[in-house]
């Protein structure tokens, strides 16, 4: 599974500005989904890869980003 890393309290994607390989996104994806996850910056959001099927990614149901 793949998807955008989401902040569960705000419903927003994690923003990033250095597109492609991005240490911040990789670190945040691994922290949120486990050390087997990958991550990079895609369309100014942290995109996480190699997630388990039940992983919760953006958008959250019934929660829109209100940042």
Curated annotation (Swiss-Prot):
Record domain LCN-type CS-alpha/beta: where: 1-66
Classification via InterPro entries: LCN-type_CS_alpha_beta_dom, Scorpion_toxin-like, Scorpion_toxin-like_sf, Scorpion_toxinL
SUPFAM superfamilies: Scorpion toxin-like
Keywords: Disulfide bond, Ion channel impairing toxin, Neurotoxin, Secreted, Toxin, Voltage-gated sodium channel impairing toxin
Tagged with keyword Thylakoid: no
Keyword Secreted among UniProt keywords: yes
CDD domains linked to this entry: neurotoxins_LC_scorpion
GO biological process: defense response
Signal peptide: none
Disulfide bonds: 12-65, 16-41, 25-46, 29-48
PROSITE patterns the UniProt entry points to: LCN_CSAB (PS51863)
Location in or out of the cell: Secreted
Domain notes: Has the structural arrangement of an alpha-helix connected to antiparallel beta-sheets by disulfide bonds (CS-alpha/beta).
Record function comment: Beta toxins bind at site-4 of sodium channels and shift the voltage of activation toward more negative potentials thereby affecting sodium channel activation and promoting spontaneous and repetitive firing. This toxin is active against mammals and lethal to mice. Selectively modulates Nav1.4/SCN4A, a sodium channel present in both denervated and innervated skeletal muscle.
Miscellaneous comment in the UniProt entry for this protein: Is neutralized by the single-chain antibody fragment 10FG2.
Family designation: Belongs to the long (4 C-C) scorpion toxin superfamily. Sodium channel inhibitor family. Beta subfamily.
Protein name in UniProt: Beta-mammal toxin CeII9
Species assigned in the record: Centruroides elegans
